[in-house]
């Protein structure tokens, strides 16, 4: 649907063009009002235009307002030096809610749907997933849900680390210790540590490991059989975690691109992009002080070669219009070099197709990198299990009489919701402090607050014997709390646009938290059952329920009908 912001931008753009036809097209600065008493939205362009038109901002604002039709607004006011404050009429808000209700059910479809590839999670075979994989998995899943909701064709790729020197070490160790079949990732992780120690200390073991890497690349039957067993055990463990998190991924590991590596290097050489540096083949770029190494001096390939091959495949074979890779911000330089190389080679048709969705660290309550006391990465499965147990403790504290059946059902939902929301509500670029105590609170900007508002609406339905509130019919907005709730509901597609434009889920969490606050104020100030406005207010309850449910789904959160 046309958002309130885009509708207002269109009106102001036309008004500016009519008032000042000599101006070229400009990007307008229209935002939600900084304070509610100013109105709903404000236009800040008069100050910017004053430098171009050599007129006072207030005179410019007056000229703009003179060309804006008054119909959709209850007031248009010029404030201060030349801010234009807009307040939509209650009748206009009510009519827009009718449209919003219809389109919410179908998703706010993008005008030009695209093929979007989102590469996220990407753990390494033979290693436990740890807290560092949490952000990539949760952020990537949220973005995938949002792109899908607006009609894009999304391919969720798990670019697992399933190739390289580590497998030569493991295969050699398994061969030499005559290990029986491995069924648990814990066993594999322990073997990896032993193999790594041997690799560092024993030069003969190192040579045999390197030989096994070559054997694996050459398709040696025994090496391949062991490699497949290692991958199978690891992927089974990963899938357990993805099931807990309700995350879907299509696995396409690094090994998938092996057949294309030599071809990619040769193609880059044919385009005169490769320079030898100390025997290694590198791609240099003027804008960067270091190159992207695509082939080592010993002839081996590295993860950069794989990433170039993956980018080319995703454009040429997958026909991607957008490619997002969700990894920590520490890899930013690598992905800048990767993009520059793929642009130079023509694998990326233009800038803006590829985005590195970087994110900060997870910290403990002391502000240190989140690790165990012994300094090791915290295993993700253990973290999730702890969240569920702490959620159950919180439930028992609030409801001592809760049944074991309810506890077993609600605990996992509350625990996983809390972890996801705490992560997504932090700006992804920033580090954030992981605190079970904060994320499981029933008040403040938490998953519990959203769920509490949703459950409150379920309570209204139960008391009134309704399966669902009305989703169509006459609607009027009278009271200030109704107006505030209506305006917030109508901003949902606008916030979704912002979330996808900036690739930042915290815009969506902030919106949903604001929506719960507006609904709670509406519930407090506007009597529903038996009032003259019962149907209209139930309509608002229903729209809030559906918007909360949709928004929570986009975050990967689950709802409950009661707490």
Curated annotation (Swiss-Prot):
Main subcellular localisation: cytoplasm
Organism: Chlamydia trachomatis serovar D (strain ATCC VR-885 / DSM 19411 / UW-3/Cx)
Protein's cellular compartments: Cytoplasm
Gene this protein is translated from: argS
GO biological process, one term: arginyl-tRNA aminoacylation
Catalyzed reactions: tRNA(Arg) + L-arginine + ATP = L-arginyl-tRNA(Arg) + AMP + diphosphate
Sample GO molecular function, one term: ATP binding
Database matches in InterPro entries: aa-tRNA-synth_I_CS, Arg-tRNA-ligase, Arg-tRNA-synth_N, Arg-tRNA-synth_N_sf, ArgRS_core, DALR_anticod-bd, Rossmann-like_a/b/a_fold, tRNAsynth_Ia_anticodon-bd
Protein name as it appears in the record: Arginine--tRNA ligase
Motif, 'HIGH' region: chain positions: 123-133
Gene3D superfamilies the UniProt entry points to: Arginyl tRNA synthetase N-terminal domain, HUPs, Isoleucyl-tRNA Synthetase, Domain 1
Claim: Aminoacyl-tRNA synthetase is one of the keywords in the record: yes
Homology family: Belongs to the class-I aminoacyl-tRNA synthetase family.
SMART domains, per database record: Arg_tRNA_synt_N, DALR_1
Highest taxon, organism lineage: Bacteria
Enzyme class, broadest EC rank: ligase
Pfam family, any one: tRNA-synt_1d
Gene Ontology cellular component list: cytoplasm
Subunit structure: Monomer.
Protein keywords: Aminoacyl-tRNA synthetase, ATP-binding, Cytoplasm, Ligase, Nucleotide-binding, Protein biosynthesis
EC number: 6.1.1.19
């Amino acid at each position: 649907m046309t958002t309130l912001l885009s509708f207002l931008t269109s009106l102001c753009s036309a008004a500016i063009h009519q008032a000042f036809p000599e101006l070229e097209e400009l990007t307008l600065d229209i935002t939600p009002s900084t304070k509610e008493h100013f109105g709903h939205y404000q236009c800040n362009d008069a100050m910017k235009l004053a430098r171009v038109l050599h007129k006072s901002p207030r005179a410019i604002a007056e000229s703009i307002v003179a060309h804006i039709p008054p119909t959709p607004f209850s007031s248009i006011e010029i404030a201060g030096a030349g801010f234009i404050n807009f307040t939509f009429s209650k009748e206009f808000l009510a009519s827009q809610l009718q449209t919003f209700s219809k389109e919410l059910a179908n998703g706010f479809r993008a005008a030009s749907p695209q093929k979007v590839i989102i590469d996220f999670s990407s753990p390494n075979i033979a290693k436990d997933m740890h807290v560092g994989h949490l952000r990539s998995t949760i952020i990537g899943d949220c973005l995938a849900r949002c792109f899908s909701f607006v009609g894009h064709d999304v391919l969720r790729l798990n670019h697992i680390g399933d190739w390289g020197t580590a497998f030569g070490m493991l295969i050699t160790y398994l061969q030499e210790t005559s290990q029986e079949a491995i069924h648990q990732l814990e066993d594999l992780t322990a073997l990896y540590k032993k193999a790594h120690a041997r690799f560092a200390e024993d030069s003969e073991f190192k040579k045999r490991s390197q030989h096994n890497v070559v054997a694996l690349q050459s398709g040696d039957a025994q090496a391949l059989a062991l490699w497949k067993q290692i991958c199978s055990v690891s992927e089974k463990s990963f899938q357990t975690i993805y099931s807990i998190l309700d995350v879907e991924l299509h696995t396409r590991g690094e090994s998938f691109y092996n057949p294309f590596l030599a071809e990619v290097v040769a193609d880059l050489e044919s385009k005169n992009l490769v320079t030898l540096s100390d025997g290694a083949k590198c791609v240099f770029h003027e804008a960067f002080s270091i190159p992207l190494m695509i082939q080592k001096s010993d002839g081996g390939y590295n993860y950069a070669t794989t990433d170039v091959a993956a980018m080319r495949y995703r454009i040429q074979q997958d026909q991607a219009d957008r490619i997002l890779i969700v990894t920590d911000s520490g890899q930013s330089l690598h992905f800048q070099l990767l993009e520059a190389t793929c642009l130079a080679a023509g694998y990326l048709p233009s800038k803006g197709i590829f985005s590195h969705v970087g994110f900060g660290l997870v910290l403990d309550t002391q502000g240190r990198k989140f690790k165990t006391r012994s300094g090791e990465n915290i295993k993700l499965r253990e973290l999730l299990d702890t969240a569920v147990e702490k959620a159950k403790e919180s439930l028992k504290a609030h409801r001592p009489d809760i049944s074991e059946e309810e506890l077993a059902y609600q605990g996992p939902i509350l625990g996983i919701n809390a972890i996801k929301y705490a992560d997504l509500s932090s700006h992804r670029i920033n580090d954030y402090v992981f605190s079970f105590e904060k994320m499981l609170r029933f008040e403040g900007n938490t998953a519990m607050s959203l769920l509490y508002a949703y459950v409150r609406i379920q309570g209204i339905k139960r008391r009134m014997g309704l399966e669902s509130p009305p989703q169509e019919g006459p609607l009027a907005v009278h009271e200030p709390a109704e107006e505030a709730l209506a305006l917030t509901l109508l901003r949902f597609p606008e916030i979704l646009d912002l979330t996808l434009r900036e690739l930042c889920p915290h815009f969506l969490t902030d919106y949903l938290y604001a929506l719960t606050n507006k609904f709670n104020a509406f519930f407090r100030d506007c009597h529903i059952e038996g009032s003259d406005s019962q149907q209209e207010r139930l309509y608002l309850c229903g729209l809030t329920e559906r918007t909360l449910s949709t928004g929570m789904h986009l975050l990967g959160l689950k709802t409950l009908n009661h707490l």
